[in-house]
Each structure stands twice: as C-alpha cells, then as structure tokens.
UniProtKB/Swiss-Prot annotation:
Residues of the active site: 402
Organism whose genome encodes this protein: Mus musculus (Mouse)
Processing and modification events after translation: N- and O-glycosylated.
Annotated Low complexity bias: 478-489
Amino acids binding Zn(2+) 1: 175, 177, 190, 203
Binding site for Ca(2+) 1: 131, 206, 208
Gene: Mmp9
Keyword hit for Endoplasmic reticulum: no
InterPro entries tied to this protein: FN_type2_dom, FN_type2_sf, Hemopexin-like_dom, Hemopexin-like_dom_sf, Hemopexin-like_repeat, Hemopexin_CS, Kringle-like, M10A_MMP
GO biological process: apoptotic process; cell migration; cellular response to UV-A; collagen catabolic process; embryo implantation; endodermal cell differentiation; extracellular matrix organization; negative regulation of epithelial cell differentiation involved in kidney development
Protein name as it appears in the record: Matrix metalloproteinase-9
Length: 730
C-alpha cells in the first residue's frame, strides 16, 4: 500500500446478538439507510474483510472459488490469534471489532522515509464535534499528543491557522480529502503520514458518538454539583436511568444525577434545556417561553417552523409575532440519535413500531441487537429513526492512535499496543513497549527539544465585533432544590459557560434589527428584507455554497437551489450566518474538498470552517502586494489548488497554506478568452465558470476537463443576464 493513502480507522460493527422477540418469533425489518453489511453471512463478511485488508486477491472477489484458508492463516498470524485457518469464533470476533482500514504489517512499523524533519510539531483544531464540550475536546487532543511527547523528544504546540503541521478536522461523508466517511459505525477516523499539504492531518468522523469512552458527556447547570457532568447510568427511586429525565419534577426541566446513585448521594444538576437558556438569536440567552405565538399559532415546544435549515428555535416572550424575540434550543446529546435517516434529531417517546407503543429505546426489529428509536411518534407511517446513544468512542484513545500515524508509525501486531489495528477501550497510560520502540526508532530518545516559535499564531483569534451569543455571567440565584421536590418554577435562566456557536438566520419573518457584527462597516443604505433580488442591478458577491447559489448584497443574501419548483430562499442577514463578516463583500468561495468558505472584502479575508472563523487576515499574508486592492473571485482546481482573480490578473492559490504562487500571475485572457478583464464576480457553478460584469455574465466551459484550466485557453459558450438566467426572474 502506498504510504500516501490515508489510514482509515474502520469500525465493523456487526453485532451477533438477535433482537428480543416481539411475538413468538422475532420480526426483522429493513430500516431505511441502514448498513447493508449487517445482512452478510459470516463467510461473506470474512471474504469482504480479507479483500479489504489485503489478504486475498481481487480475483477471488470476482467469482473465483478459492479456499479462504491461506488468507485466514495470514490474518490470524497478524492479529496474534490461534492459527487454525478456519473461520472460528475468535476470528469472527476480531473481524467484527473496530479497526484501521489499511493492510496489516508485522511488529512495530514506520512509514519508510516518512517522518517530520523537526521535533517541534504544531497542530490546529480546525473545527469541533458537538458531542463533547470544546474544552474537553481540546484536553483530549492535548493529552493524546502528550502520550508521545512523554517517550520521545517531541513537543506539540497548538496554533490557530492552516500552516500547522497537523490539521485536525471533524467531518462527515465526503469531507474533502477523497476518502469519504460512511456514517455511524463505519470508518471511524483516518490520518496521513508526515509531509506537506494534507500529509500529517487527522480526520474524525462526526457521525460517530465521541465521548471519553464511557457514554455521552452531558455538562450540568445549577443543582448542587458545581457543573459536574451527568453520570450514566444512575439510580433514582430504585430505577436506572441512562439519559436525562424529568421524572420527579413537575416543571418539565430535564435533570440527571452526577453520581451513580442519586438516592444515596443526592447530587444532581440540570441538563442543557431550552427551559434554562437559549443560544444566539436576539433573546439575550433567556429561556423559552411556552406556549408562544408564531404566525398566529400557539407552540408548546421548540419548533423548526419558519426555517429552511432545520434548527429548533423558540420565542423568549409569549408572542413572537409582536416582540420578534427568539433563541435557538440547546441540543439534547443524551437523546439525539446517530446514524439511521434522522441523525441529529431527538427520540420521540412514545412511538409506534409494528403497531406496538414504545416508551424507551428498543432493539426490536433488528438482527444485531442495537438500540434504536423513532424520531416521530409513528415509525410505521413515517419510517424516521436513528440509533440511541451508546458508550461512544474515546476521542483521546482514537486521537492518540491517529497521531501515531501522523508522526510516522504504522500498525503493530502486538495486541496490547496502542498502534494495534483493533480498537478497544482501556484506562491508564496507553503505550506499550512496542509503541515506544517505534516512536524512538523515528525520533530517538532524550529530553524534549527547546521550544521554537511556530510560524503562525499560538493564541486564539478574537472576534472583530461583540459576539451575539447569550451572556456568560452566572445568574444571581441558583436552584438547589432536588428533583423529588418538584418546584413549580423553572430554574433561573443563564448558562454558566459560553454556548457553542449556533445556527444561522432568524425564524421567518426575520428580525428587523441590523447586523450586530461588522456593524461599523455596514452600508448606510441597508437593504430591506422585503426587497426583491430581481430588482438588484449588481450583487456584491455570488458563490456556490453547500450546493446552493448565494447572492450577497449590502449585508443580506439569498439562496437559490437549481431544482425544478424550488423557491428562492431569503433574504437572510449575512451577519447572522457568518457573524465576523462586514456588510459588504467582494467575493466568496467554497473549497469543494474541505468545505471551508473563503470571504473577501477589500484587503481582508475570512475563512469559515463550519461555525469557526479564522480572520480577518490581510491579503499580505496571502502573498498579495498593496497593488491588489480586492479579490474578484476564485475558481477551484484539483489537488487543493484554486485560481485567484483581481483586476484582470490571475494567480495560482494553495487552499491549505493560503498562499499564492507569485511566479504564476498571468493576464486573465491568457486562460479565458472573451471574458471581461474587469469582471467583479467570478465563481464556479455546476462545473462551469462565470464572469460577471454589470447585469451580465459570461459563462465558460472548461476545454480541459481533466486539469480544468491547464494548458488550453477556455472559451465563452454563453452570455446572459444574472437575474433572468441565473436567478430565473420573470
């Protein structure tokens, strides 16, 4: 296997237990978007596994009937199993165990010739999972690096920019490196060996449940436990609970015990809930008010009505139509499903399945015995479901394993080694002598090197305008009454720590307040939400983001999906979706691989990864001199590159290092014949390049589809109106 292929941490979660009987005989159903591999026979599973990990030739999977015995013997030797050559119970158990997705090798191994040429390694946490609080994720990664720093002369410094040696990213499905994740319990994580570009980076599948290895981590608020996390399971009035509950209370506020036995210890806290606080919006973090009025209708729970992005929200007064005050409802991680076809939704109890009512998660209907729930009240009619939270995977252990790969280590055949390909949870110091021998073979022994300043900042960038999230000052009064008392009033509002960034935009109709971020640069002629984009002569910027064409103008934007019958969405406040941005933009661009979104205004650039922003950064940092006053647009190329345009010139731009090649600058007409040299919006849409000037666009089809804009001049194939032909205005 080429060392340039990423190391895929694959979870083959095919349980061997059968579902509990529903009637006399268990009834099994096909769940929408479920893993098909769960229906494989043992032999089919073994054949697929042996082929995937290099033990059999591709010809055997093409229909040639050959014995599996030689391949099984190799597998058993590699995994230190009894070498029977048979598909016995121990071998099947190993096949069903979480593991990395690369062919296995012998005792401690390193990627030949691949190691860092310096011992002061930098890393950047590009984005976060919502499964754990950010400080816990930061701590898990720091501890994972420290494992290797304890036994080798290596230091690890966290930085806040893409110049880092190791870029850490959470992603789902196709996340930008050409090696997509496949949802819950498939590929768990992967990393690349040392080197430039994507080499050395570590990616984690955000469809998994990340924990400390012992179940979901739920921080608590108020109560009498000083913010200690929930302890699952816990006992209350003799009954065991594996999630937050409202039992024992008459105000509907979910709570949990922070020890194993509430009946004995009496320690508790309140779980994240809209009854305690809301996130973002314009309600100043106040809790939801139920019921509330929206568009003349009464709501007694959080809703997604009026939104196109699926985020749950509520009013923070009794009447949204009158007061226009709202916030977003906190996520209930303990009750949020993973996988299935409703990832991120909440379990709905009770729900109906095969005519029977369920008030808790069940394994009925499944051959693998895994717990699941419906996310609507009736699975039989809606077919919406997901897996209930399980113990999750230790982010610390998986990260320590992946960072071993990022430092140059391959897999070990020693079962006790951290670099052994099969995942297992363990406590204490995770390194085995085999791991230590491997890392010291690469980097030697001895004390840590003297620290040297990294090439990028080691302090987290601060927002350029006051944040819009709710205040972090604790309330003056904390409820300390235990859950059995059942007070009639809700706990005092206000979380004790900053909430994570929230969703975008306001419920329809949108708030009338101007943007609160970047307000110093806002246009003096603010666009009215009622204005029709078909009346806009020239847009500030146009870009394809998340499959939708975005049209920006004076701090607002519209979204257009090119689907038959799909309505134009918006207007939305730009500052609600991307709070750090100014009101006026010059251009925007989404990296098709990493899904990072680049924004340009004047001589500044912002880069959004999900809800995390880097910037503003000066164009000087990109290698562009003062003569470049703005960026007109970017077009993607292969291998993490793009073309960057300004004033009739074009540069080659590296999307990871965020640097232009100063030797690459040429005139636009050398690559694109017939387009306006002074185009103000340049973007790619549906694999074609668009150059806009005034009300018109010039569309270019690439002549060289393999290398896009290499070697051949690309010709204009259409000229049209932005509003009539792109926005499809009447």
């Amino acid at each position: 296997m080429s060392p340039w292929q990423p190391l895929l941490l694959a979870l083959l979660a095919f349980g061997c237990s059968s579902a509990a009987p529903y009637q006399r005989q268990p009834t099994f159903v096909v769940f929408p978007k479920d893993l098909k591999t769960s229906n494989l026979t043992d032999t089919q599973l073994a054949e697929a596994y042996l082929y995937r990990y290099g033990y059999t030739r591709a010809a055997q999977m093409m229909g040639e009937k050959q014995s599996l015995r030689p391949a099984l013997l190799m597998l058993q030797k590699q995994l230190s199993l009894p070498q029977t050559g048979e598909l016995d119970s121990q071998t099947l158990k190993a096949i069903r165990t979480p593991r990395c997705g690369v062919p296995d090798v012998g005792r401690f191994q390193t990627f030949k010739g691949l190691k860092w040429d310096h011992h002061n390694i930098t890393y950047w946490i590009q984005n976060y999972s919502e499964d754990l609080p950010r400080d816990m994720i930061d701590d898990a990664f720091a501890r994972a690096f420290a494992v290797w720093g304890e036994v080798a002369p290596l230091t690890f410094t966290r930085v806040y920019g893409p110049e880092a040696d190791i870029v850490i990213q959470f992603g789902v499905a196709e996340h930008g490196d050409g090696y997509p994740f496949d949802g819950k319990d498939g590929l768990l994580a992967h990393a690349f060996p040392p080197g430039a570009g994507v080499q050395g980076d570590a990616h984690f599948d955000d469809d998994e449940l990340w924990s400390l290895g012992k179940g979901v981590v739920i921080p608590t608020y108020y109560g009498n436990s000083n913010g200690a996390p929930c302890h699952f399971p816990f006992t209350f009035e003799g009954r065991s609970y594996s999630a937050c509950t409202t039992d024992g209370r008459n105000d509907g506020t979910p709570w949990c015990s922070t020890t194993a036995d509430y009946d004995k210890d009496g320690k508790f806290g309140f779980c994240p809930s809209e009854r305690l606080y809301t996130e973002h919006g314009n309600g100043e973090g106040k809790p939801c008010v139920f019921p509330f009025i929206f568009e003349g209708r009464s709501y007694s729970a959080c809703t997604t009505k009026g939104r196109s992005d699926g985020y749950r929200w509520c009013a923070t007064t009794a009447n949204y139509d009158q007061d226009k005050l709202y916030g977003f409802c906190p996520t209930r991680v303990d009750a949020t499903v993973v996988g299935g076809n409703s990832a991120g939704e909440l379990c709905v109890f009770p729900f109906v399945f095969l005519g029977k009512q369920y008030s808790s998660c069940t394994s009925d209907g499944r051959r693998d015995g895994r717990l699941w729930c419906a996310t609507t009240s009736n699975f039989d009619t809606d077919k919406k479901w997901g897996f209930c939270p399980d113990q999750g995977y230790s982010l610390f252990l998986v990260a320590a394993h992946e960072f071993g790969h990022a430092l140059g280590l391959d897999h070990s055949s020693v079962p006790e080694a951290l670099m052994y390909p099969l995942y297992s949870y363990l406590e204490g110091f995770p390194l085995n002598k085999d791991d230590i021998d491997g890392i010291q073979y690469l980097y030697g022994r001895g004390s840590k090197p003297d620290p040297r300043p990294p090439a990028t900042t080691t302090t987290e960038p601060q927002p350029t305008a006051p944040p819009t999230m709710c205040p972090t000052i604790p309330p003056t009064a904390y409820p300390t009454v235990g859950p059995t008392v059942g007070p009639t009033g809700a706990p005092s509002p206000g979380p004790t720590s900053s909430p994570s960034p929230g969703p975008t935009g306001a419920p329809s109709p949108g708030p009338t307040a101007p943007p609160t971020a970047g307000s110093s640069e806002a246009s003096t002629e603010s666009l009215s939400p009622a204005d029709n984009p078909c009346n806009v002569d020239v847009f500030d910027a146009i870009a394809e983001i998340q499959g939708a064409l975005h049209f920006f103008k004076d701090g607002w934007y519209w979204k257009f999906l090119n689907h038959r019958g799909s309505p134009l969405q918006g207007p939305f406040l730009t500052a609600r979706t991307w709070p750090a941005l100014p009101a006026t933009l010059d251009s925007a661009f989404e990296d098709p691989q990493t899904k990072r979104v680049f924004f340009f205004s004047g001589r500044q650039m912002w880069v959004y990864t999900g809800k995390t922003v880097l910037g503003p950064r000066s164009l000087d940092k990109l290698g562009l001199g003062p003569e470049v006053t703005h960026v007109s647009g970017l077009l993607p190329r292969r291998l993490g590159k793009a073309l960057l345009f300004s004033k009739g010139r074009v540069w080659r731009f590296d999307l990871k290092s965020q640097k232009v090649d100063p030797q690459s600058v040429i005139r636009v007409d050398k690559e694109f014949s017939g387009v306006p040299w002074n185009s103000h919006d340049i973007f790619q849409y549906q694999d074609k390049a668009y150059f806009c000037h005034g009300k018109f666009f010039w569309r270019v089809s690439f002549q060289n589809e393999v290398n896009k804009v290499d070697h051949e001049v690309n010709q204009v194939d259409d000229v049209g109106y932005v509003t009539y032909d792109l926005l499809q205005c009447p």
